[in-house]
């Protein structure tokens, strides 16, 4: 991680941190060094999603937001009954994990519904249902990317696995390392070559986009969980399940499936 070059004010404890590049923390008999990166700028005071006046959703067991959730970061609604964000290092790590999982979930949800929608409108796929598509690798003709044999033609699960590891690993390594020259200071919002449209040029608009990204990402993670459950219970894709529900809501609904579900059948 990039080291801080200015004095920091901790939003978790309200205490001034010493203006040094590294913070030393003693652990047992030894000593570990923890490097913290300063945010480039604080969230805009004019946004309703930041600061003490932001919308709060505290849940049934919290009367007020904890002191370490001050509204500095996007998606902070003041709810942390379990105290998962109390430790600054853990909070920073969890924020990064949430954003990365949100982005993958949004891509995944789009990838689950798009082939089914296209197939329903006449586009030919070998298999449009997301959890069945991978099995086409073992079919006689293999799996054609986007149903086109002139693109990627896959017949080896090991080759697909290797490509996934290499490509995804390269992208994540590129992001975490700060790009080819290590110029990126914030691995969550790297900007630069990762922002060719310049969406982060305006700080006010960028702060709003961070909130929108997390909102949509959280919904996408719940959606993916729902797709997993649907696949196990009904054996159908999300679009087909939606069509069945709209055709007969009284029969095709979550309650009916939950009360009649028998594992293994």
Curated annotation (Swiss-Prot):
> What is the topology of this protein in the membrane according to its UniProt annotation?
Multi-pass membrane protein
Q: Where does chlorophyll a 3 bind?
A: 136, 146, 213
> Which residues take part in binding chlorophyll b 5?
164, 261
Q: Which GO terms describe its molecular function?
A: chlorophyll binding; metal ion binding
Q: What do the Gene Ontology cellular component annotations say?
A: chloroplast thylakoid membrane; photosystem I; photosystem II
Q: Where is the major localization of this protein?
A: plastid
Residue numbers binding chlorophyll b 2 = 103, 152, 181
Q: Which domain of life is it from?
A: Eukaryota
Q: Which residues bind chlorophyll a 1?
A: 79, 85, 98, 218
Gene3D superfamilies per the UniProt record, alphabetical:
Chlorophyll a/b binding protein domain (1.10.3460.10)
Q: Where is the transit peptide?
A: 1-36
Query: Can you tell me which family this protein belongs to?
Result: Belongs to the light-harvesting chlorophyll a/b-binding (LHC) protein family.
Summarize subunit and interaction data from the UniProt record for this chain: The LHC complex consists of chlorophyll a-b binding proteins.
Domain comment, in the record's words?
Answer: The N-terminus of the protein extends into the stroma where it is involved with adhesion of granal membranes and post-translational modifications; both are believed to mediate the distribution of excitation energy between photosystems I and II.
Indicate what this protein is called per its UniProt record.
Chlorophyll a-b binding protein type 1 member F3, chloroplastic
- What is the species listed in this Swiss-Prot or TrEMBL entry? Polystichum munitum
């Amino acid at each position: 991680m990039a080291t801080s070059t200015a004095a920091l004010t901790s939003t978790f404890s309200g205490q001034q941190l010493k203006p040094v590049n590294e913070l030393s923390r003693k652990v047992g008999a030894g000593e570990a060094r923890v490097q913290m990166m300063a945010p480039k700028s604080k969230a805009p005071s004019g946004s309703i999603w930041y600061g003490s006046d932001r919308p709060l959703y505290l849940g049934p067991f919290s009367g007020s937001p904890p002191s370490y959730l001050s509204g500095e970061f996007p998606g902070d609604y003041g709810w942390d009954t379990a105290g998962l964000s109390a430790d600054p290092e853990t909070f920073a790590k969890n924020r990064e994990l949430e954003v990365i999982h949100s982005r993958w979930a949004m891509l995944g949800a789009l990838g689950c519904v798009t082939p089914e929608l296209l197939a329903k409108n006449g586009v030919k796929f070998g298999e449009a249902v997301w959890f069945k598509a991978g099995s086409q690798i073992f079919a006689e003709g293999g799996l054609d990317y986007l149903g086109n044999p002139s693109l990627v033609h896959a017949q080896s699960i090991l080759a697909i696995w290797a490509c996934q590891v290499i490509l995804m690993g390269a992208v994540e390594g590129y992001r975490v390392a700060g790009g080819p020259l290590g110029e990126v200071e914030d691995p969550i919002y790297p900007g630069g070559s990762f922002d060719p449209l310049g969406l982060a040029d305006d700080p006010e608009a960028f702060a709003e986009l961070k909130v929108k990204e997390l909102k949509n990402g959280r919904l996408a993670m719940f959606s993916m969980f729902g797709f997993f459950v649907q696949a196990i219970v009904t054996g159908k894709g999300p679009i087909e399940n939606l069509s069945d529900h709209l055709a007969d809501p009284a029969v095709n609904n979550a309650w009916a499936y939950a009360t009649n579900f028998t594992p293994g059948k």
